[in-house]
């Protein structure tokens, strides 16, 4: 039965959509940049838990009273009861400042559940962490290229990497636009997204390869038909998989605590983007590339002299 919607024939619209998102992302980066956590820049994180829903205005007043005014993105509230406070400060706190914060906490919130927890990172450690995070992502991408090139072919590998870059860019743009904090859990989420997306893409590529062996397309139209059929054959599997993982990620986002909120938020965006790119970006790119090779081969055959 012929599929109701020809994904490959409509691929130019998906490319335009992704292109528009990419342009919007570049604009967001240029205007806002990233809200880096102390993992990637020097500074301090202060965390404590109250026995009530966090009154943000009073927390800001508490820090202002000791000469540490908070910016718009410096205060994060989490916890199931919204009673956990995490404050990011650009400077490394001294022992005196930490004592002043503890005294201010007892003064403003005498019934607080726990004492102040402070985590400080110096510039050298932050720089090293940022560099290692970039290396981790690049190493993962390189290993993926090699694996797909060996198992399938080089065109499949490049198409898959383009889809992965698309997913990573979508997540990065969302964090820049929403001013979400980029920390080490974000890097972990990015690597998780890469793993999920490439797994989904490999399943699709494997189905395409099997159908190519069976149908043996000789023209571009036949190639497009085979790939389109393959995409619809794995569509239900892809949708069920992403929905299953999404449900778990959403539950973690709301009930998993403040420490993994950035991880789960990035995961939610990346899962949706990964499911989209595996079907609507990676495979159409491969088809466009393979079609060009087939057309060149056809023109070469026509131009070849007829043997006497």
UniProtKB/Swiss-Prot annotation:
Protein's UniProt keywords contain Transcription regulation: no
InterPro entries: SecD/SecF_arch_bac, SecD/SecF_bac, SecD_SecF_C, SecD_SecF_C_bact, SecF_bac
Pfam families: SecD_SecF_C
Membrane topology: Multi-pass membrane protein
Localization per Swiss-Prot or TrEMBL: Cell membrane
GO annotation, cellular component aspect: plasma membrane
SUPFAM superfamilies from the UniProt entry: Multidrug efflux transporter AcrB transmembrane domain (SSF82866)
Keyword match RNA-binding: no
Biological-process GO terms, alphabetical: intracellular protein transmembrane transport; protein targeting; protein transport by the Sec complex
Transmembrane segments: 14-34, 134-154, 158-178, 185-205, 238-258, 267-287
Subunit-level organization: Forms a complex with SecD. Part of the essential Sec protein translocation apparatus which comprises SecA, SecYEG and auxiliary proteins SecDF. Other proteins may also be involved.
Listed NCBIfam families: 2A0604s01 (TIGR00916), transloc_SecF (TIGR00966)
Family according to the record: Belongs to the SecD/SecF family. SecF subfamily.
Protein name: Protein translocase subunit SecF
Organism of origin: Alicyclobacillus acidocaldarius subsp. acidocaldarius (strain ATCC 27009 / DSM 446 / BCRC 14685 / JCM 5260 / KCTC 1825 / NBRC 15652 / NCIMB 11725 / NRRL B-14509 / 104-IA) (Bacillus acidocaldarius)
The encoding gene: secF
């Amino acid at each position: 039965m012929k599929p109701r919607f020809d994904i490959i024939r409509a691929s130019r619209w998906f490319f335009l959509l992704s292109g528009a998102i990419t342009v919007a992302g570049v604009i967001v980066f240029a205007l806002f940049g990233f809200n880096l956590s102390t993992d990637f820049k020097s500074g301090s994180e202060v965390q404590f838990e109250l026995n009530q829903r966090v009154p943000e205005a009073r927390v800001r007043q508490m820090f202002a009273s000791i000469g540490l005014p908070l910016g718009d993105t410096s205060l994060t509230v989490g916890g199931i009861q919204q009673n956990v406070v995490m404050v990011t400060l650009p400077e490394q706190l001294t022992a005196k400042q930490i004592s002043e914060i503890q005294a201010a906490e007892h003064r403003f919130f005498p019934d607080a559940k726990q004492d102040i927890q402070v985590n400080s990172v110096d510039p050298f450690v932050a720089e090293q962490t940022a560099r290692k995070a970039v290396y981790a992502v690049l190493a993962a991408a390189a290993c993926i290229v090699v694996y797909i090139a060996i198992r399938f072919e080089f065109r499949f590998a490049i198409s898959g990497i383009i889809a992965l870059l698309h997913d990573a860019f979508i997540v990065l743009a969302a964090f820049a636009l929403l001013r979400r904090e980029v920390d080490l859990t974000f890097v972990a989420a990015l690597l998780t997204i890469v793993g999920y997306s490439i797994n989904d893409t490999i399943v699709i590529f494997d189905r395409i390869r099997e159908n190519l062996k069976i149908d043996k397309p000789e023209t571009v139209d036949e190639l497009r038909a085979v790939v389109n059929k393959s995409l619809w054959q794995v569509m239900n599997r892809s949708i069920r998989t992403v929905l299953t993982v999404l449900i778990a990620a959403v539950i973690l986002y709301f009930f998993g605590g403040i420490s993994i909120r950035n991880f789960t938020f990035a995961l939610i965006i990346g899962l949706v983007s990964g499911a989209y790119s595996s079907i609507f970006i990676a495979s159409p790119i491969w088809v466009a590339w393979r079609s060009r090779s087939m057309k060149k081969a056809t023109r070469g055959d026509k131009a070849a002299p007829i043997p006497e």
